[in-house]
């Protein structure tokens, strides 16, 4: 479902998920053994050791997934969907930032440009938008007038003439 354009409350949104794991320098644990689908008998020992070393690792299927990055088809579909709406949306929502925002934020030595940030840079260069929200950097920071990194912050995105009304309760 990466690269889709949605209209919600009269506003258009381009969405594109995915990111490179930046905190896997010490490896990826696989709780399942490769042979016969049994559990890895040393999984708990390995995890305890990595935790004791304050290691940066992930667990396959729990905190890391093989498809964390988009494939060529998903990226092409995203660009095609933007083209269908004249390369103009109200909001962009992604997990990763585009490369230029990554540089503006400094990256803290953990984040490096990659296939997805470069793709999103292409989206930025070819798309007109009001605001872009992303969260991969785990910060609450306004990077530019249009681009905002969200982590623990929640924002209300105003819709056109949107007033939420609760359904009336029936007296019983």
Q: What is each model feature region?
A:
Residues 1-4, 75:
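Short acidic (Asp/Glu) patches
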Residues 2, 16, 94-95, 134-136:
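Short His-Asn-centered micro-motif
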Residues 3-9, 142-144:
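Short acidic-hydrophobic surface loop/beta-edge motif
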Residues 3-5, 15, 161-163:
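Conserved hydrophobic/aromatic beta-strand scaffold that supports enzyme active sites
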Residues 9-110:
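Active-site-proximal loop/helix segment associated with metal-binding centers of metalloenzymes
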Residues 74, 171-172:
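A short C-terminal boundary segment appended to hydrolase-like catalytic domains
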Residues 97-171:
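Conserved beta-sheet core of the metallophosphoesterase superfamily
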